[in-house]
Amino acid sequence: MKIFSVALSMLRPVRFLIVAFTCALLFLSSTVPAFAISSYQSEPTEATDQLLETQKATDEVARSAPLGLKEVQKKSNEGLNEVQGAADINKQKRPANSQDSSSVEGDIQNFLEKVTGKN
């Protein structure tokens, strides 16, 4: 018990600094998300065109009879899948555009070789 009283008496002069640091930390951690709001302002109609086209296709499929295997294969071969078609095809990762990328396994092996010094 005497150790606690000695430790508390030693911390008494820096108690103000600890409280001030804690208050500053709480204040800054609550204001950082507010700064993130102004970092990127998107247009209100930026992605609505693609969404409207997808919604139209979805409504048409919902109103019609279920498609057969041939129709589904034909539609899915037009793009990434039956629903998306070719929307945002350049933004999607697929084998055709990711041949030059390195695998996670290769990255880990290179990292371990660097750490252990083996080449």
Curated annotation (Swiss-Prot):
Ranges of Polar residues composition bias in the record: 95-104
Region of interest (Disordered), ranges: 64-119
Superkingdom to which the source organism belongs: Bacteria
Descriptive protein name: Uncharacterized low temperature-induced protein all0459
Organism listed in the record: Nostoc sp. (strain PCC 7120 / SAG 25.82 / UTEX 2576)
Lineage, opening ranks: Bacteria, Bacillati, Cyanobacteriota, Cyanophyceae, Nostocales
